[in-house]
Amino acid sequence: MPTILVSALEASSNMHLEELHRNLPEDYRFIGVFEGKNALYSPREFSIMGFRDVIGRLGFLLKAHKEMVQLAKQADMVLLMDSSSFNIPLAKKIKKQDPHKKIMYYILPQVWAWKKWRAKSLEKYCDFLGAILPFEVGYYQKKAQYVGHPLLDEIKYYKKDIKGETLVFMPGSRKSEIAKMFPLFVKVAQILEQNEGFKRRVLVVPSFFKGLDLKALYGEDIQLFEISYDAHKSLFEAEFAFICSGTATLEAALIGTPFVLAYRAKTMDFLIARMLVNLHYIGLANIFYNALNDETPGLGESQLHPELIQHFLSVEGLLKAYEEMDRERYFKESLRLREYLKHGSARKIANEMAFLLNLT
C-alpha cells in the first residue's frame, strides 16, 4: 500500500487531486494537507490571501511545515501541488531530511510570471515536474514534462453555442475574496433584474463549504441566489458569469461561457505584486490565450475576456462588461484555447507516480 504525502492547499488543487485519485489504484493512501480522509489539515485552514495575512498566520504555517516534514518519514513519496510559498521550502526540508525521498510537483508555480529563479529550486529538490501548460517546459532544464491540463479531465460540459438560461456569480473561495466581491455581485444582480427582468441567479459555492453556515459567510443577501456546488454544470447553463480571479476563469473559458473577471486586493499587496509580476493580464484564460497567439503567426496581444481590477472594478464596470462583450468572438476564440490545451493530465501523472514508486 503506497503512502503519498500530499500538500494541496488550494481549492483548485483539490479538484485536480480528486480526478488524479480516480486514476490511481485503490490501495494508494494519502496523508498530509488535502480535502479528505486521513488529512493532517484541511485546505480551509490555509485560506490566506495577501502578504499581511501570511505574516499574521506565520506561527500556524511554521507549525504545519514542521509537522509535514515529520509526516514525510511515513510516506513512500511526496506530491506537491501549487502553493509554491509553502511547498518549495517544504520540498527543500524533506530532501534535506531524506535525499532519496521521491518528490513530484504537479501544478507548477508560475515562474513565467515572476520569480523565475524558482525553476532552479524546483529542479534541485524535485524528481518530476508536471507542467500543465505547453510553454512551461521551456523554463526548466530537464525534469519538466508537459502532462496536459487537468481541467480537461474534469470538465464534462462544453457549450455548443453561447445560449444560456442563468447568470452565474463566483466571488471566490477565500473568505477575504468573498467579503470584497459578493456585495458588488449582489448589486449587479439587483440592477440586472430591474433592467432586464428576473433571471435565475446562481451563486457557486466551493464544495468544501458544504455543512458550513453560508449565511454567516456571505450575509443575508445570499437568499437572493440559488446555491450550487457544481461550478462546471452551472457555467455550462449560464448566459454569462461574474467571476473572481482564479481557476474558475479558465474553467469558464474552456466550457465556453462568456464572463468578466473581477478582482480587488489590498492596496499594498497589489502594489507589491505589480512590481514583482511581469504580466499584462491576471486571468489565466487571458494569459494562456496570449501564449497561444504568440505561437500563431500574425496574431498580436489581445483580451479573450474583460478584466476589472482594483480601482477599475465597480458595479457600473461589471454591468458594462456584461452588456458590451462580443459573445460571438469570445465563443470562437474559447474553442481555439480549448484545442491549444488539448487533453487532461490525471492518467499521465498517475503513471509517473507509479514510475517514481518503482511499480512499473
Swiss-Prot record:
Xref: Pfam families: LpxB
One GO MF term: lipid-A-disaccharide synthase activity
Record function comment: Condensation of UDP-2,3-diacylglucosamine and 2,3-diacylglucosamine-1-phosphate to form lipid A disaccharide, a precursor of lipid A, a phosphorylated glycolipid that anchors the lipopolysaccharide to the outer membrane of the cell.
Cellular component GO terms held in the UniProt record: membrane
KW Glycosyltransferase (keyword) present: yes
Family annotation (InterPro entries): Glyco_trans_19
Sequence similarity: Belongs to the LpxB family.
Known catalytic reactions: a lipid X + a UDP-2-N,3-O-bis[(3R)-3-hydroxyacyl]-alpha-D-glucosamine = a lipid A disaccharide + UDP + H(+)
Source organism, top-level taxon: Bacteria
KW Lipid biosynthesis (keyword) present: yes
EC number(s) from the headed UniProt entry: 2.4.1.182
Pathway: Bacterial outer membrane biogenesis; LPS lipid A biosynthesis
BP terms from Gene Ontology: lipid A biosynthetic process
Name recorded for this polypeptide: Lipid-A-disaccharide synthase
Swiss-Prot/TrEMBL keywords: Glycosyltransferase, Lipid A biosynthesis, Lipid biosynthesis, Lipid metabolism, Transferase
Enzymatic class: transferase
